[in-house]
């Protein structure tokens, strides 16, 4: 039988069984090593209330704590919500993560390779 991926779409190497997690979108049971995982980091307080909190705070340099949320998707929901994209047969072999889009202070896109050359 032909093999679509080198890791069979999983990260289970050498383990017999892996516990299941639930997809946050459809609640499907997905093996933990197969689930597509993403972290979102948000402020605990919405942006409109940050200024009010800083004015009312006794501490001058109080940093508002952040929420670290782990999102776990099944493969079909991750593709549907464009968390991951379908790649060609040659593209699937590329194991390096895609280049991240960076923005400068003006809000313009910055090419990461050009920035690395300047340093």
From Swiss-Prot:
Keyword Cytoplasm (UniProt): yes
Subcellular location: Cytoplasm
UniProt-recorded Gene Ontology molecular function terms: mRNA binding; structural constituent of ribosome
Residues covered by region (Disordered): 88-119
Disulphide-bridged cysteine pairs: none
GO cellular component: cytosol; cytosolic small ribosomal subunit
Predominant location category: cytoplasm
GO biological process, alphabetically ordered: cytoplasmic translation; ribosome biogenesis
Keywords of this entry: Cytoplasm, Ribonucleoprotein, Ribosomal protein
UniProt-listed Gene3D superfamilies: Ribosomal protein S26e (3.30.1740.20)
Family: Belongs to the eukaryotic ribosomal protein eS26 family.
Quaternary state and interactors: Component of the small ribosomal subunit (SSU). Mature yeast ribosomes consist of a small (40S) and a large (60S) subunit. The 40S small subunit contains 1 molecule of ribosomal RNA (18S rRNA) and at least 33 different proteins. The large 60S subunit contains 3 rRNA molecules (25S, 5.8S and 5S rRNA) and at least 46 different proteins. eS26 interacts with eS1 forming part of the mRNA exit tunnel. eS26 interacts with TSR2.
Other remarks on this protein: There are 2 genes for eS26 in S.pombe.
Function: Component of the ribosome, a large ribonucleoprotein complex responsible for the synthesis of proteins in the cell. The small ribosomal subunit (SSU) binds messenger RNAs (mRNAs) and translates the encoded message by selecting cognate aminoacyl-transfer RNA (tRNA) molecules. The large subunit (LSU) contains the ribosomal catalytic site termed the peptidyl transferase center (PTC), which catalyzes the formation of peptide bonds, thereby polymerizing the amino acids delivered by tRNAs into a polypeptide chain.
Name of the protein described by the UniProt record: Small ribosomal subunit protein eS26B
Organism field: Schizosaccharomyces pombe (strain 972 / ATCC 24843)
């Amino acid at each position: 039988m032909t093999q679509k991926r080198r890791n069979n779409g999983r990260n289970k190497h050498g383990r017999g069984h892996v516990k299941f997690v639930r997809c946050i979108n459809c609640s499907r049971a997905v093996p933990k090593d197969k689930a597509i995982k993403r972290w979102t980091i948000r402020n605990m307080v919405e942006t409109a209330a940050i200024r009010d909190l800083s004015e009312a705070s006794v501490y001058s340099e109080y940093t508002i704590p952040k929420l670290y949320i782990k999102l776990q998707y099944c493969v079909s929901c991750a593709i549907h919500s464009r968390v991951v994209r379908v790649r060609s047969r040659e593209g699937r072999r590329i194991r390096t993560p895609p280049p991240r889009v960076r923005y400068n202070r003006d809000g313009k896109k910055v090419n990461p390779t050009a920035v690395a050359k300047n340093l």
